[in-house]
């Protein structure tokens, strides 16, 4: 698998994110303006995200999936049953279809999404895992989960392990610096922000448990 193969695969996933966001919003039955109001962003940003003209930040993406009651898997991978007309698949169709899937995920097969502010997420599971987000996260030089002083919070608990680079983690008023081999765990309902503190890209393994039970905060 070449770097070009991985890039092309990611681009094909990226191209469908806006359509899936729009489908999820339509399914809930709210306007772009109303979603923007709930998230505290401009309606034009929602329009740009749905049209593929802008990338969401980590905070905005978490806010959107929470408000629309969808999982990250549904937005990144595309789930025809959830992102289509909302109708459940007939039982007889499920019984007739056989889709064996390996639990192994190779680097070139990861579902990935590029976010604003130099952040990239690659899913490390082959199938949708419900209330579990298991990702390989990359923070480019200067990359951050949210802009300065704009912390996010959501339901769940986070676990992280740094592979490369220096990752800054702010939790409330506390600041932590993680170097390769360091790990961290914290309650996601606490305001937090992740950012690259060094001069090389950060690579980390991140695990969020229970975010799907969220109610908007």
Regions found by a protein language model. Name each.
Residues 134-139, 185, 190, 199-215:
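A short hydrophobic beta-strand segment most commonly corresponding to one strand
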Residues 19-38:
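Short basic helix-loop element that most often maps to the first helix and adjoining turn
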Residues 107-149, 206:
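A short glycine-rich, His/Asp/Glu-containing loop-to-beta-strand
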Residues 136-140, 153-169:
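Short, conserved beta-strand element in jelly-roll/cupin
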Residues 78-117:
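Short, charged recognition helix plus adjacent turn
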